[in-house]
């Protein structure tokens, strides 16, 4: 296949319809960054760090491993889509208030993973073990994770 050939991808990103063009094999993270969605970080590019976490149909995924072509017909949410009317989401507010993260590189991925975790219906509150498991794909070099876990617990109480 000639690399100059492109595919057309129709999807919704942060509530807005998009018709995008990409070379087959392009990761979703790259395509999103080309649209100016710079919260989608390119860290490890092998699905180990979680800096590229976005929601696809409500599920947190590593967008560096997710082909752009697979986004056809999907609803994609990035950190840029979480604030509504200039107001941060309750998860964004909680992370900002708690100071759970330091340098900020991991913050978008953690917020998106937290958002997905909190959106899942359940009968009981999340346990610390469930939170740690839910954030296991998101690396943070600056913290010991306890403040992040506490932030998720606070988010659940205030949602």
Curated annotation (Swiss-Prot):
Describe cofactor binding as the record notes it.
Answer: Binds 2 [2Fe-2S] clusters.
Residue numbers binding [2Fe-2S] cluster? 44, 49, 52
What InterPro entries would the database entry show?
2Fe-2S-bd, 2Fe-2S-bd_dom_sf, 2Fe-2S_ferredoxin-like_sf, 2Fe-2S_ferredoxin-type, Beta-grasp_dom_sf, Diverse_Oxidoreductases
Its cofactor is: [2Fe-2S] cluster
* GO biological process terms, semicolon-separated: hypoxanthine catabolic process; purine ribonucleoside salvage
Q: Where is the 2Fe-2S ferredoxin-type domain?
A: 7-82
Provide this UniProt record's keywords sorted from A to Z: 2Fe-2S, Iron, Iron-sulfur, Metal-binding, Purine metabolism, Purine salvage
Q: Keyword check for Lipid metabolism, yes or no.
A: no
Q: What molecular function terms (GO) are annotated for this protein?
A: 2 iron, 2 sulfur cluster binding; metal ion binding; oxidoreductase activity
> Which pathway, per its entry?
Purine metabolism; hypoxanthine degradation; urate from hypoxanthine: step 1/2
Tell me, in a sentence or two, what this protein's role is: Iron-sulfur subunit of the xanthine dehydrogenase complex.
**Can you state the subunit structure given in the record?**
Heterotrimer of XdhA, XdhB and XdhC.
Per its record, how is this protein called by name? Xanthine dehydrogenase iron-sulfur-binding subunit
Q: Which organism is it from?
A: Escherichia coli O157:H7
